[in-house]
């Protein structure tokens, strides 16, 4: 007798059964060096070379970071973990409330078809205004972070200075 017996009724036409996927959506595992409060160096984008404070890991596998804006002009923003270098410098983020920041907070507003057409007709009139809510949130986070930053001497100057490599610098030998 075989391990699996043939079915009693068999269809005249063979129907291909779809393959079962064995992939599952799992949360990203971050590097051990990426802990909230770590000072990171941004490697790409508008703020490349800036030192920022890591606040939180978001659901879309991005990192929530801030300059603070008052120190080096980097606002609250999402960054891919691939484009940062973690330094050994840490800042306490216990007093910073980051519960309200999630993927929806950073989502772009969807435009209707009519609004899209108007935006395409007059591209020079497009100026993106910053929501007052975002500005207020930035001020609250900055205030809490600056209180912690001031406790460490020269940390404010360190965060305001940008990172770059000079001729002869060997990045694989640098200790961040």
From Swiss-Prot:
User: Which terms in the Gene Ontology molecular function aspect does this entry carry?
Assistant: RNA binding; structural constituent of ribosome
Which keywords describe this protein according to UniProt?
A: Cytoplasm, Isopeptide bond, Phosphoprotein, Ribonucleoprotein, Ribosomal protein, Ubl conjugation
Other remarks? Present with 38400 molecules/cell in log phase SD medium. There are 2 genes for eL6 in yeast.
Q: Which GO terms describe its cellular component?
A: cytosol; cytosolic large ribosomal subunit
Which Pfam families has this protein been placed in? Ribosomal_L6e
> Which part of the chain holds the cross-link Glycyl lysine isopeptide (Lys-Gly) (interchain with G-Cter in ubiquitin)?
128
Query: What is the protein's quaternary organization?
Result: Component of the large ribosomal subunit (LSU). Mature yeast ribosomes consist of a small (40S) and a large (60S) subunit. The 40S small subunit contains 1 molecule of ribosomal RNA (18S rRNA) and 33 different proteins (encoded by 57 genes). The large 60S subunit contains 3 rRNA molecules (25S, 5.8S and 5S rRNA) and 46 different proteins (encoded by 81 genes).
Organism of origin: Saccharomyces cerevisiae (strain ATCC 204508 / S288c) (Baker's yeast)
Q: Which CDD domains match?
A: KOW_RPL6
Q: Which PANTHER family match?
A: 60S RIBOSOMAL PROTEIN L6 (PTHR10715), LARGE RIBOSOMAL SUBUNIT PROTEIN EL6 (PTHR10715:SF0)
Q: Where is this region: Disordered?
A: 1-22
Q: What is its biological role? A: Component of the ribosome, a large ribonucleoprotein complex responsible for the synthesis of proteins in the cell. The small ribosomal subunit (SSU) binds messenger RNAs (mRNAs) and translates the encoded message by selecting cognate aminoacyl-transfer RNA (tRNA) molecules. The large subunit (LSU) contains the ribosomal catalytic site termed the peptidyl transferase center (PTC), which catalyzes the formation of peptide bonds, thereby polymerizing the amino acids delivered by tRNAs into a polypeptide chain.
Hey, which family's this protein in? Belongs to the eukaryotic ribosomal protein eL6 family.
Residue list for modification Phosphoserine: 12
Please give the name of this protein.
Large ribosomal subunit protein eL6B
Which domain of life, per UniProt?
Eukaryota
Q: Which GO terms describe its biological process?
A: cytoplasmic translation; ribosomal large subunit assembly
| Cell location | Cytoplasm
């Amino acid at each position: 007798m075989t391990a699996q017996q043939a079915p009693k009724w068999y269809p005249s036409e063979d129907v291909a059964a779809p393959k079962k996927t064995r992939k599952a959506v799992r949360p990203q595992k971050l590097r051990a060096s990426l802990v909230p409060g770590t000072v990171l160096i941004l490697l790409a984008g508008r703020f490349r070379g800036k030192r920022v404070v890591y606040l939180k890991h978001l659901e879309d596998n991005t990192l929530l970071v801030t300059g603070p804006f008052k120190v080096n002009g980097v606002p609250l923003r999402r960054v891919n973990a691939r484009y940062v270098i973690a330094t050994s410098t840490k800042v306490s983020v216990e007093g910073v409330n980051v519960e309200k920041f999630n993927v929806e907070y950073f989502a772009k507003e969807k435009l209707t078809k009519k609004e899209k057409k108007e935006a395409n007709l007059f591209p020079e009139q497009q100026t993106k205004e910053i929501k007052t809510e975002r500005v207020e949130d930035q001020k609250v986070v900055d205030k809490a972070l600056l209180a912690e930053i001031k406790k460490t001497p020269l940390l404010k100057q360190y965060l305001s200075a940008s990172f770059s490599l000079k001729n002869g610098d060997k990045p694989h030998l640098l200790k961040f």
